[in-house]
Amino acid sequence: NEKTSSLLQVLVSIQAQILIETPYCNEPGHEFQNGTPAGDKYNKEYNDHTRFFVMKSTMLDLLENPDSYPQFTEVIKTHFKLKKDYVINICEKWISESTKYADQMKKMLDKMKPLLNKL
């Protein structure tokens, strides 16, 4: 409720519902699949799809176009400079776990590495 919820409550809700290993099972109508073989399969596919678009839209795009959001250019550059090794490691992990997007994700990471190293 926007009239009674604090920012902290919203952030805790996001953390509890989205930033978990199995966000698919938090989608309405899918809760009953949590912990089942079908739920595990759908979670893996959901995570694979989400990770692909995270790499594409929130990593590669921002590295290629850091001035897309002029008010955040320095924040974006500083974030990637400080987290460069972590970003590369997590992307490599995601690629190794991907069943559908591994080749595309590998190409994106190959584009990201020189951009990260320039920071």
Where do the language-model regions lie?
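Charge-rich (especially acidic), low-complexity segments
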Residues: Y24-L119
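E2/UBC-UEV (E2-variant) core
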Residues: N1-P23
